[in-house]
A protein has these predicted regions:
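A short, flexible loop at the N-terminus of ABC-type nucleotide-binding domains that lies
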Residues: 1-20, 25-27, 68
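ABC nucleotide-binding domain signature
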Residues: 30, 73-80
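Conserved ABC transporter NBD signature motif
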Residues: 55-66, 70-71
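ABC-family P-loop ATPase nucleotide-binding domains
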Residues: 79-136
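Conserved signature/switch motifs of ABC ATPase nucleotide-binding domains
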Residues: 133, 142-143
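Catalytic Walker B motif of ABC-type/P-loop ATPase nucleotide-binding domains
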Residues: 148-152
Length: 153
């Protein structure tokens, strides 16, 4: 299994998430639900960004909170409320990605940016909302990710 959530429970003051989910490799899965249903919480559990109050979360056969740096480099993530500093250009972001991800493919990334009309020398703060979303997705798929998690609104 690529992802396993077994008897997982996460409690907040006004919300409790309980779930079991097994996702095999080579699948495309969508989580659909109302705002506040627990989709983002589920993704954060999968990524080891938060710990469950009960149950086990495994990714690549390992506990999510114990993924190595090498394992984490296999993850491509897009969260609507995250990203690089808006004072950077796409070229600067590309150089940063090369430093952090050995499998980052800059030529492919820049080619895709051109295809989707993402200006490489303009600061991200000058981008439209749609251009920022495209950039996040292009970054997530430009480093040979084995698991892609998109949490967009």
């Amino acid at each position: 299994m690529l992802i396993q959530l077994d008897h997982v429970k996460k409690e907040y003051e006004d919300f409790t998430l309980e779930l079991d989910m097994h996702i095999p490799e080579n699948r495309v899965i969508g989580l659909i639900g109302a705002n506040g249903a627990g989709k983002s919480t589920t993704f954060k559990l999968m990524l080891g960004l938060i710990r469950p109050d009960a149950g086990d979360v495994k990714v690549f056969g390992k506990k999510a909170g114990e993924l190595s740096a090498e394992d984490r480099q296999k993850l491509g993530t897009v969260f609507s409320d995250s990203g690089f500093s808006e004072y950077l250009t796409v070229q600067q972001v590309g150089r940063i990605m090369q430093e952090f991800y050995p499998d980052f493919e800059p030529e492919q990334f820049y080619r895709r940016c051109e295809y989707f009309h993402i200006p490489q020398k303009k600061k991200i703060k000058e981008f439209s909302t749609g251009m920022k979303a495209k950039l996040k997705i292009l970054l997530a798929v430009s480093h040979d990710s084995h698991l892609l998690i998109l949490d967009v609104k």
